[in-house]
Each structure stands twice: as C-alpha cells, then as structure tokens.
A protein has these predicted regions:
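Acidic/aromatic-lined carbohydrate-recognition and catalytic surfaces
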Residues: 1, 7-183
Length: 183
C-alpha cells in the first residue's frame, strides 16, 4: 500500500506586504444565475467584482465537498460525506460544455432552474434539497443527451485515476438515494 505524506515546513517566508482577501460562505451568496444557492458561477461573479474594485490576493470559501447523494442533504458544508469529490450543488449547469452542446435541453433545464432563481432576490432561508434535486436532474439530462469525445476522455481518465474509491462512492450514492436511512 502507498499513501501521501504531507509535511509542513518549520517556517515560511512572509510576503513583502500584507495581503488582502475575502472570506465567503459561497452557498449563502446569490447572483442572477444561481439556482437559489451560490455556486461556481457565483464565485466567478464575486471574483470579477473584486477585480473591478482593485483586486484581492485571495478568496477563501467554505468546503465544497460532496454531501448526501440525494435530498435531504446536510445543511452544513462542514459535514461532508466525502472530501474526495465535489458537491454538485456548486456546479453552474449553464456553464458546462454539455449545456452549450445541447440547446434543445435549455428550456427544460430553465424550467428546473426558474423557481429556484426567484429565490435569489429574497431574504428567504436557503433550501438545499430542491437545488440538489434540480441540479442532479439537469446534469443527468445533459449526460444522457451525450458528451463530446474530449469530455468522454476526461471522464475515462477520471474514472481510471479515482479507481475503487470512486466505485465505492458511486455505489453508496445509488444505495443512499434509494434508502435515506443510509445518510
């Protein structure tokens, strides 16, 4: 068996000047394109806004690890089911190559997103369950419509690289989606 060993240095050099940045709970941010909860598209909007204001040396966000495979999902991003994979709630569906490749699905996906996007302009509490359910459905629609050769190769390489860990996680996701008692 092999494993990676991380060792911290005894000391670090300090930068010449203080650094400035922003810390954000990404899920709590909303922009026009978000599905009621901040996602990677929201992070892009935040980064662009910071750049226009003179820049930031860093943006610190909450953990974005995988949560439960299906609703109900844990509200806290600090209690992931695994730290190996990302949470699909943070994927901006409209920014994927598959969305661009399948305009015939845009209306159906917009129907999934529209009621969630209305929440972007309210002070209502965040509701993760409908966002997760809708994003998973949208991503499934796009995947079953077909992915391009380049993305298929990326998926093949990802599956090969992640190996048994990915197989175990996906099997657990399938079981947990059908038996909420497992989560």
């Amino acid at each position: 068996a092999t494993s990676t060993l991380l060792v911290s240095p005894q000391s670090l050099e300090l930068p010449d000047a203080p650094r400035t940045g922003v810390m954000a709970q990404l899920y709590s941010l909303r922009d026009r394109g978000a599905w009621g909860i901040g996602d990677y598209g929201t992070l892009e909007v935040l980064s662009d806004s910071l750049q226009k204001l003179g820049g930031a040396d860093f943006v610190l966000v909450n953990p974005m690890h995988a949560a439960e495979a299906a609703p109900p999902v844990e509200d806290s991003p600090y209690l992931p089911t695994t730290r190996r994979y990302t949470n699909p709630i943070y994927i901006r569906v409209e920014n994927t190559p598959e969305y661009a490749a399948h305009p015939e699905l845009h209306a159906e996906i917009e129907q999934l997103a529209a009621p969630l996007k209305k929440r972007n302009h309210t002070a209502d509490l965040l509701e993760r369950d409908p966002v997760v359910a809708s994003k998973i459905k949208a991503l499934h629609l796009l995947y079953t419509a077909g992915i391009g050769d380049e993305r298929a190769e990326q998926l093949r390489a990802f599956r090969e690289r992640e190996g048994e860990g990915l197989v175990g996680f996906t099997e657990w996701c399938e079981r947990a989606a059908n038996d909420p008692a497992l989560t």
